[in-house]
Amino acid sequence: MIINYLDKVPKIDPEAKIFKTADVIGDAVIGKGSSVWFGAVVRSDVNTIRIGEDTNIQDNATIHVTTALYPTTIGNGVTVGHNAVIHGSTIGDNVLIGMGAVVLDGCRIGKNSIIAANSVLLGGTEITEGVLVAGNPVKIKREVTAEEIEGLKKSAENYARYARNYLTYSKDSIYSQTDISMIIENLTSC
C-alpha cells in the first residue's frame, strides 16, 4: 500500500516499481528505477527516507527512521536483501545489505561495501568505502574486490530487470505507473 501520514505523501518516481504487498508510508522518496518488493516496508512516519535510483528493497525488508535524530538515506544501485532492517542510517551507493542484516540508528556505510547476511551494525557504526563486513557486531573482514564491485552493480541491474518482468508478466502483483499516479493524487487531495 502507498499511505500518507500526517499530510506527508510518498514521492515515487514514475519509473520506480512498487509491489502491491509492499508498504510505502509518509515522507518517503523512491528514486528512478528503484523497486520495493513483496512485504517490504518503507515507513517514514517520524522522519524522512530517501531511496536513490536503481535500488532494490527486497522481500520483507524494513526501512525505518528515528524521530528528529536519524533519517534514512539509501544511495543509488543499492541491494537491500530479504528480511534486512535499516533504521535511521545512511547507505552509500552500490552497497549490498545482506539478507537478514540489521543496521541500527546512526550508522554510515561507504560506497561499494558488502554487509554480510545476518550481520548486525550497532548504532553509530561507520563502515568505510569498499570493505566486506560480517558478524554481530560487525568487523571488517577484507577489502572488496573489483569483481565483487561489478557483482554489486549486476545485482541492482538484475533486480531492475526482474521488476520489469513482473510488470509485463504478472501485472496484478505490481502497481503500474498509472496506479501510482492515481494513488498519489488521491492521497494529496485528502
Where are these regions (language model features)?
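Glycine-rich hexapeptide-repeat left-handed beta-helix
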Residues: 1-11, 45, 53, 59-62, ...
